[in-house]
């Protein structure tokens, strides 16, 4: 059977579909790595997840910053009462970082770096497990 006749009788389409299905299954069959970091800081526990161990730890720090950092609490309170906070509909502490760049930078850069430094200094403890 020549290539020309294969395309004429329509059997090439199911064959191509079969190859595509095999490629999709091959690419998606491996389970993605998942790391979970459990941070204990100030007597409270925060969990962060990511495929990378370092990012899981940073995500746990970000969660600490949003939920328990006094600096973020103060910034959020001031912003919430500002015209920008009112215009944004007075969002939650978690949502506010997506509405204001300064809040986002404080959580993900300033506070997160301080949190990582506390871990390094032994003031905070993090346990990370990757599957």
Model-assigned labels for residue ranges:
Residues 14-24:
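Bacterial N-terminal signal peptides
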Residues 33-131:
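Post-signal/leader-peptide non-cytosolic segments of secretory proteins
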């Amino acid at each position: 059977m020549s290539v020309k006749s294969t395309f004429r009788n329509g059997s090439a389409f199911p064959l191509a579909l079969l190859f595509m299905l095999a490629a999709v299954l091959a690419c998606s069959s491996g389970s993605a790595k998942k790391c979970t970091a459990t941070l204990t800081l100030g007597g409270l526990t925060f969990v962060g997840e990511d495929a990378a161990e370092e990012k899981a730890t940073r995500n746990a720090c970000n969660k600490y910053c949003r939920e328990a950092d006094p600096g973020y609490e103060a910034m959020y309170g001031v912003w919430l009462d500002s015209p920008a906070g009112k215009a944004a509909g007075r969002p939650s502490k978690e949502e506010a970082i997506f509405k204001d760049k300064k809040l986002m930078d404080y959580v993900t850069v300033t506070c997160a770096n301080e949190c990582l430094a506390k871990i390094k200094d032994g003031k905070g403890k993090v346990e990370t497990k990757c599957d």
